[in-house]
């Protein structure tokens, strides 16, 4: 009070007031505070103070020729005083208004192109729908999210090269545009931005927004795709959320979503093949997502998901060092352990060999719908603090943590035998056996776990074995929290190794990922996924296998035909025929194969019995290991559309229908392509026309290498000799003529010579 009286007393003297309001501030400390450094210390005050002046803006001198001194209302637009310290003019804010209304017009054609991301955002918001606001406690957890919708996925360096090439093409400096996406974008942008008058720096900045993924570590309670993150401030607060449906999708979110689906399908399929790693790589390299090679997307896309990371590991790319168990991402935050093999007995007295982690460790567990902090010692859960969207999600997290703890009471809670298998019919490892068992039914596990009295801690609550919340009791060591656990924020990537069975390990040998961790969730991809690999034909069911197998034969007919006549065994072993075997009834596969192979051998032996349509139709059946039997078949059965359907050995059927006049093949009513029938099938002498310009020398001569197809003959040099496969699957030796003049006579002599060469 004394101080206030004193101040009042001072202020009552007129001199004090004058000193405080009129004199300059000359205290060194204050001057220093507000003048040192380039950073503005009080921007809003500075702005208000500047705008209160008459001429707060400076402009280039040319403005005086382009803007009148006064506007229609007679207000002065610029001052004759020049700006202190530069050769610019002092200008009133009214000049800006005048310029906006009456200044020169420039072409606006480039604006939507350069500011594309903004225009698209406006469209998304215009068409988006905002629903009701709900007031409730928000469990937000920090996740690394994409904050920039509509971008490509170039690395910063790749983008920099593209931007330099587009915006400053004549600048010196080495720029190497290597990836397909770099070249496409550069070409596209150069065309779009021809004669663009927008400042190059602005164009460069906007291009960066379009090319590079920008991520931030933000607290999120709902959707994490970039079209939700761009409205995060509108959709979730501390105690409220607003429902929102985006008014459009962006390619980067679609790529992320489709990549996950493709990776899951590929890992699931590879896991059941004879050589999972080789199959996985073959599929990754032959798959396209939305027209872009999957391997290119994997190299650029930072999405962290189990299947995606397995694919990346197979390609030798670095991945996050966290590991996955039961669909949760575990990150060790402190402690350490050594691993030791130990044999344990289940409640059913079954022996399990488990790798025990000895030592005290703390982990964060992050799943799609629940998160937790886990503290554990050797085979003992010390504490689990879990939070989740709903009861079911919390249960999932608790089961995973209990199994991961390797506690004895968990192993003793097993009722019945553990014999879960993976898709390839191999037994799962013991930890996954236990996990599957309790995911089916955790009642005994929770009952046997034990309960304890709990202290009242803010934001924490106990949970009983039947999942009812309680403030007095809880399952031992387990608490439910209102607060979520943040995702691991580091973007650090580590070198990993992958074995033949797709188990991914870090350099210490810890398993980070395995196919068991890949989610079984099925989704519909947003972008078209094109699996060129025959291994993925079965993804759309038996019909797709049938159509794809025959399409493959037709597309590769030229080479198939040569192999058919010269190296049939190699042809029968082609992996493209593998999926087809699942359509042929198991009991009769071998007999069919033996029958078809014998039939084909007769065709090779007996002149004039070569029949393109029949070879194509029956070829897939010859791929199974043959059984020798005297059985003859007039039709072969395939299992499609839920029942056995017949393919006739001679003639058409609904499954395989070839129209001789239109040359089109339909499989189950679906078009499978055009068949180029071989010459001399029923039309004698046509093959000679194909051999114009060649002289037939006689029977096949192995010294001149494998038989060429008729298409490959054109590559021969004049006078060069080669074996060639003609009409009926027969091989003859030919020489390319040295003179073109004699071509006319070829047609007549060829027919005679072929007959002689063959007989």
Swiss-Prot record:
Annotated signal peptide: none
Gene3D superfamilies, per the entry: Polymerase Basic Protein 2, C-terminal domain
GO molecular function list: RNA binding; RNA-directed RNA polymerase activity
GO cellular component: host cell mitochondrion; host cell nucleus; virion component
Subunit composition and interactions: Influenza RNA polymerase is composed of three subunits: PB1, PB2 and PA. Interacts (via N-terminus) with PB1 (via C-terminus). Interacts with nucleoprotein NP (via N-terminus). Interacts (via N-terminus) with host MAVS (via N-terminus); this interaction inhibits host innate immune response.
Main location (coarse class): virion
UniProt name for this protein: Polymerase basic protein 2
Similarity comment text for this entry: Belongs to the influenza viruses PB2 family.
Keyword Membrane: no
InterPro entries for this protein: Flu_PB2_2nd (IPR049110), Flu_PB2_6th (IPR049114), Flu_PB2_C (IPR049115), Flu_PB2_CAP-bd (IPR048298), Flu_PB2_middle (IPR049111), Flu_PB2_N (IPR049106), INV_PB2 (IPR001591), PB2_helical (IPR049113)
Compartmental location: Virion; Host nucleus; Host mitochondrion
Keywords: Cap snatching, Eukaryotic host gene expression shutoff by virus, Eukaryotic host transcription shutoff by virus, Host gene expression shutoff by virus, Host mitochondrion, Host nucleus, Host-virus interaction, Inhibition of host innate immune response by virus, Inhibition of host MAVS by virus, Inhibition of host RLR pathway by virus, Inhibition of host RNA polymerase II by virus, mRNA capping, mRNA processing, Viral immunoevasion, Viral transcription, Virion
Chain's role: Plays an essential role in transcription initiation and cap-stealing mechanism, in which cellular capped pre-mRNAs are used to generate primers for viral transcription. Recognizes and binds the 7-methylguanosine-containing cap of the target pre-RNA which is subsequently cleaved after 10-13 nucleotides by the viral protein PA. Plays a role in the initiation of the viral genome replication and modulates the activity of the ribonucleoprotein (RNP) complex.
Gene Ontology terms describing biological process: 7-methylguanosine mRNA capping; cap snatching; DNA-templated transcription; symbiont-mediated suppression of host cytoplasmic pattern recognition receptor signaling pathway via inhibition of MAVS activity; symbiont-mediated suppression of host gene expression; symbiont-mediated suppression of host mRNA transcription via inhibition of RNA polymerase II activity; viral RNA genome replication
Site (Mammalian adaptation): 627
Any Pfam family the entry gives: Flu_PB2_1st
Motif range (Nuclear localization signal): 736-739
SUPFAM superfamilies the UniProt entry points to: PB2 C-terminal domain-like (SSF160453)
Highest rank taxon of the organism: Viruses
């Amino acid at each position: 009070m004394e101080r206030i009286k004193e101040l009042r007393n001072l202020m009552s003297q007129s001199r004090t007031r004058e000193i405080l309001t009129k004199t300059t501030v000359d205290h060194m400390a204050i001057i220093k505070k507000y003048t040192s450094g380039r950073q503005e210390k009080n921007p809003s005050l500075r702005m208000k103070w500047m705008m209160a002046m008459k001429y707060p803006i400076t402009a280039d001198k040319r403005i005086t020729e382009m803007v009148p001194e006064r506007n229609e209302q007679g207000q002065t637009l610029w001052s004759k005083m020049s700006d202190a310290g530069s050769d610019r003019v002092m200008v009133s804010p009214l000049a800006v208004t005048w310029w906006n209304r009456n200044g020169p017009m420039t072409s606006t054609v480039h604006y939507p192109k350069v500011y594309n991301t903004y225009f698209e955002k406006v469209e998304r918001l215009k068409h988006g729908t905002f629903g009701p606001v709900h007031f409730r406690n928000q469990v937000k957890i920090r996740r690394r999210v994409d904050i920039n919708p509509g971008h490509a996925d170039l690395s910063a360096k790749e983008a920099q090269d593209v931007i330099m090439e587009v915006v400053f093409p004549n600048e010196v400096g080495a720029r190497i545009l290597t990836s397909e996406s770099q070249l496409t974008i550069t070409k596209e942008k150069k065309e779009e931005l021809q004669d663009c008058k927008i400042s190059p720096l602005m164009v460069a900045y906007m291009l960066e927004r379009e090319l590079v993924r920008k991520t931030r570590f933000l607290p999120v309670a709902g959707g994490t795709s970039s079209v939700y993150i761009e409205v995060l401030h509108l959709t979730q607060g501390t105690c409220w959320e607003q429902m929102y449906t985006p008014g459009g999708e962006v390619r980067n979110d679609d790529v992320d979503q489709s990549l996950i689906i493709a990776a899951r399908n590929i890992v699931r399929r590879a896991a059941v093949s004879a050589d999972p790693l080789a199959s996985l790589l073959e599929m990754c390299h032959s798959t396209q997502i939305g027209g872009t090679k999957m391997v290119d997307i994997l190299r650029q896309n930072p999405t962290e998901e189990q299947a995606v990371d397995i694919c990346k590991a197979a390609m030798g790319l670095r991945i996050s060092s966290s590991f996955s168990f039961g669909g949760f991402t575990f990150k060790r935050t402190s402690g350490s352990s050594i691993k030791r093999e130990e044999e344990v007995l289940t409640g059913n007295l079954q022996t399990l060999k488990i790798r025990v982690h000895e030592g005290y460790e703390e982990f964060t567990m992050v799943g799609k719908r629940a998160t937790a902090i886990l503290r554990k010692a050797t085979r003992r859960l010390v504490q689990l603090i879990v939070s989740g969207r709903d009861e079911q999600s919390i249960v999932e997290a608790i089961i995973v943590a209990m199994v991961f703890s390797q506690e004895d009471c968990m192993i003793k809670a097993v009722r019945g035998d553990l014999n879960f298998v993976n898709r390839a019919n191999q037994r799962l490892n013991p930890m996954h056996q236990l996990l599957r068992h309790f995911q089916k039914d955790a009642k005994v596990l929770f009952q046997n776990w034990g309960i304890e009295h709990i202290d009242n801690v803010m934001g924490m609550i106990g949970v009983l074995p039947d999942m009812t919340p309680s403030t007095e009791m809880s399952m031992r060591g387990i608490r439910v929290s209102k607060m979520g656990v943040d995702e691991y924020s580091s973007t650090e990537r580590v070198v990993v190794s992958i074995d033949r069975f797709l188990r991914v390990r870090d350099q210490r040998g810890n398993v980070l990922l395995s196919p068991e961790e890949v989610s079984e969730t099925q989704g519909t991809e947003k972008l078209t996924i094109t699996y060129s690999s025959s291994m993925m034909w079965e993804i759309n069911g038996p019909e797709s296998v049938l159509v794809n197998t025959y399409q493959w034969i037709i597309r590769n007919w030229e080479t198939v035909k040569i192999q058919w006549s010269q190296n049939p065994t190699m042809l029968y072993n082609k992996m493209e025929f593998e999926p087809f075997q699942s359509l042929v009834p198991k009991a009769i596969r071998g007999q069919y194969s033996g029958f078809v192979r014998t039939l084909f051998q007769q065709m090779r032996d007996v002149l004039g019995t070569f029949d393109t349509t029949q070879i194509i139709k029956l070829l897939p059946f010859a791929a199974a290991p043959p059984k020798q039997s005297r059985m003859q078949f007039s039709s072969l059965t395939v299992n499609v559309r839920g029942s056995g359907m017949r393919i006739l050995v001679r003639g058409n059927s609904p499954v395989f229908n070839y129209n001789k006049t239109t040359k089109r093949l339909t499989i189950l009513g679906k078009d499978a392509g055009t068949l180029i029938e071989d010459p001399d099938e029923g039309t004698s002498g046509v093959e000679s026309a194909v051999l114009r310009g060649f002289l037939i020398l006689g029977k096949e001569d192995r010294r001149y290498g494998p038989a060429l197809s008729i298409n490959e003959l054109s590559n021969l040099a004049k006078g060069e000799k080669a074996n060639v496969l003609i009409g009926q699957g027969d091989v003859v030796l030919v020489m390319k003529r040295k003179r073109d003049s004699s071509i006319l006579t070829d047609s007549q002599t060829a027919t005679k010579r072929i007959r002689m060469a063959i007989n």
